[in-house]
Amino acid sequence: MSTRPEEAGNIKVGSFIVIDGEPCKVVEVEKSKTGKHGSAKARIVGIGFFDGGKRSIVVPTDARVEVPIIKKFTAQVVAFVGDNVQLMNLEDYSTFEIPMPQEEEIKSKLSEGVEVEVWEVMGRHKIMRVRA
């Protein structure tokens, strides 16, 4: 898996972390003060990048959490195969299939030959936008 460690206290809203093995975009971060016993805690809430599920964790602020490494590249739509889209990476010309995006504004603009921006997160791909 392509992740790197990061201290929980350094996580900001809008960044990405791995919660329960799923990459998530952070939507809320709460930090509690240190008490009489114990260290400060961080409560991090994230929305799943691929499934849209809401997840949260509570960890000490000095604990290490996994941050996914996101690779962004341009691909071209080659064909539609059932509920999948076949894409060709424009950097190395390799082809791969991914599920059809759920977002209607992306799905409506897809057609063969169109260039799209793809994010690769932890070995999985997602179309983020259609290039004009």
UniProtKB/Swiss-Prot annotation:
Gene3D superfamilies the UniProt entry points to: 2.30.30.30, Nucleic acid-binding proteins
Gene Ontology annotations of biological process type: positive regulation of translational elongation; positive regulation of translational termination
Any single Gene Ontology cellular-component annotation: cytoplasm
Primary site of residence: cytoplasm
Keywords: Cytoplasm, Hypusine, Initiation factor, Protein biosynthesis
MF terms in GO: ribosome binding; RNA binding; translation elongation factor activity; translation initiation factor activity
The name this protein goes by in its record: Translation initiation factor 5A
Organism this protein belongs to: Thermofilum pendens (strain DSM 2475 / Hrk 5)
